[in-house]
Regions:
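Cytosolic-side transmembrane-helix boundaries in multi-pass membrane proteins
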Residues: 1-14, 20-24, 31, 230, ...
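Alpha-helical transmembrane segments of multi-pass membrane proteins, especially transporters
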Residues: 7-8, 61, 65, 89-97, ...
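Hydrophobic core segments of alpha-helical transmembrane domains in multi-pass membrane transport
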Residues: 8-24, 69-76, 97-103, 123-128, ...
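Interfacial/capping segments of alpha-helical transmembrane domains
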Residues: 20-43, 166-178
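Single transmembrane alpha-helix segments in multi-pass membrane proteins
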Residues: 22-28, 32, 43-107, 119, ...
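Transmembrane helix-bundle core of multi-pass membrane transporters
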Residues: 40, 148, 152-218, 325, ...
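Helix-loop-helix "hairpin" substructures at the membrane interface of multi-pass membrane proteins
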Residues: 193-270, 295-296
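Transmembrane alpha-helical segments in multi-pass inner-membrane proteins
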Residues: 251-257, 263-331
Length: 354
């Protein structure tokens, strides 16, 4: 491990220390607040509350939130490795989930067929949308930031139109709930005194991380993606087909985003809200950067950001620290991680000039 690979760990540590200082200045107990974050995420014991709810319930809810965040971060990471910036993860998530919901979610297929179909459709639709962005970059030199933002709007309003016209629930004004057989859950039942809702998507996410590690570290395509991301001109001189590699990278990125979409809308939730894009796709950009653009690194960064997000409500009610403090803490972490990226770049330049 290189020395500057430890920079993300130090930036997170420094951010948590700054969080302690800020919470202390507010007159609250920072250590209790951090412990409450863990309790709210189901990572530390606490008393049961309400009906069938307690630590186990909170932990399975945490897994449901972690899964799409991890997959969305993988999507951003793959694009970054190719020197591309996929800001359209939220749109790709919605496109994949909408198609999967219409084709499978409202059907009467048995779970043994419905769940694999949902995953495959999510992967395929996400890859198609991502591949379109890559093709526009290759064929017409349209910057992927512009095209992904436009795709976000197109997907958002097309999906909203069909939801409002054909699939709206008259009470909730969201899309109709999908069938239980199509939900990406392994276990959804009450065991003893606790409700268990374990996501199938966590296995999908683990497989996706392993596949990404293998792709980037052991395959020719992975080498080509990293070469194009480092220097497209040098890669072209080396005989690598830059356009083809970018299209494939965006297809892989979109596929991961599609998986994030189906695990979010057909796992974490059971419906889609018209004209609303999931913030997960945007948060994933910061998570991927915080994870040092490494498949293993984003496991830890996704874990950290999800803990802060899921535990904030319990922290607010127990420690008296406003839930907005969790968002501020996330912002501090990302700001200092950006400074860490600058330090890493300066270290690399210093070594080159020695």
């Amino acid at each position: 491990m290189k020395k500057h690979d430890l920079i993300p760990f130090f930036t997170v540590l420094l951010s948590l220390v700054l969080g302690i200082v800020v919470i202390a200045l507010l007159g609250k107990n920072p250590f209790l607040a951090y412990y409450n974050l863990l309790q709210g995420s189901g990572l530390a014991p606490k008393a049961s509350y309400a009906g069938h709810k307690g630590m186990i319930t909170d932990f399975t809810s945490f897994l449901n939130a972690l899964t799409p965040m991890l997959l969305a971060s993988l999507s951003v990471l793959i694009a970054l490795k190719a020197g591309l910036f996929n800001i359209g993860v939220s749109g790709q998530m919605l496109a994949a989930a909408f198609v999967a919901t219409v084709l499978v979610g409202y059907s009467e297929l048995p779970a043994v067929l419905a769940k694999p179909l949902v995953i495959l459709i999510g992967l395929a639709v996400g890859a198609l949308v991502g591949g379109l962005v890559g093709y526009l970059r290759h064929r017409f030199n349209i910057n992927e930031v512009v095209s992904t933002i436009m795709c976000n709007y197109i997907v958002q309003f097309v999906a909203s139109f069909f939801i409002n016209v054909l699939f709206v629930d008259p009470v909730s004004r969201q899309s109709k709930n999908i069938g239980a057989a199509s939900r990406l859950t392994l276990v959804d039942t009450v065991v003893g005194d606790y409700k268990m809702d374990i996501p199938l998507g966590i296995l999908v996410a683990a497989a996706a991380v392993a596949a990404t590690v293998f792709l980037l570290g052991k395959t020719t395509l992975g080498f080509e993606i990293k070469a194009v991301g480092s220097s497209s001109r040098a890669a072209e001189y080396a005989g690598i087909r830059v356009g083809r590699t970018r299209v494939l990278a965006m297809m892989l990125s979109g596929g991961a985003a599609g998986l994030a979409g189906v695990t979010y809308y057909l796992g974490y939730f059971c419906s889609m809200q018209p004209r609303v894009l999931a913030s997960t796709g945007y948060d994933a950009i910061a998570v991927a950067l915080l994870g040092n653009s490494s498949p293993i690194g984003i496991i830890f960064s996704s874990f950290l950001i999800t803990v802060i997000s899921k535990g904030s409500t319990y922290m607010s009610s127990t420690a008296g620290v406003q839930a907005e403090m969790a968002s501020a803490l996330t912002g501090i972490i990302l700001l200092i991680s950006a400074c860490g990226a600058y330090v890493r770049e300066r270290l690399d330049r210093w070594k080159e000039n020695r």
